[in-house]
Amino acid sequence: SDFSAITDSALKNGYTVGWDGDAADPYFDYSGGLAYMPEPISNFTKERQKAFEDQSTLLDHMMHIVAVVADKYGKKWYYIKNSWGDNSNSLGGFLFMRDDYFKMRTVAIIVNKQAIPAAIRKKMGL
């Protein structure tokens, strides 16, 4: 997805990303420091749009993506600073969001336009 490509490009090039999406999902386990989707999703774009339209995805929270890592199985996780304070969970206010949750529950991202890959900037008319 363009959301993932832009976010990955930004992080790779030293930028951070503002994330706007759903923190009310049952699999957004902030106290445990994880956000993930429990079942595989075949078409994230279609399913994300459907969830936004039927309001099963809420636009209710913003956070700050500062890094991306891979687990021992090769799954991508974004390392994210939450705004709820350093003492709000056992990870000092951070959490790991797996790529599937990011693709399904992201509503918007905020990034410096220089961090957007050239092909996507062109598509956007920037």
Describe each region flagged by the PLM:
Residues S1-L126:
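Active-site signature of cysteine proteases
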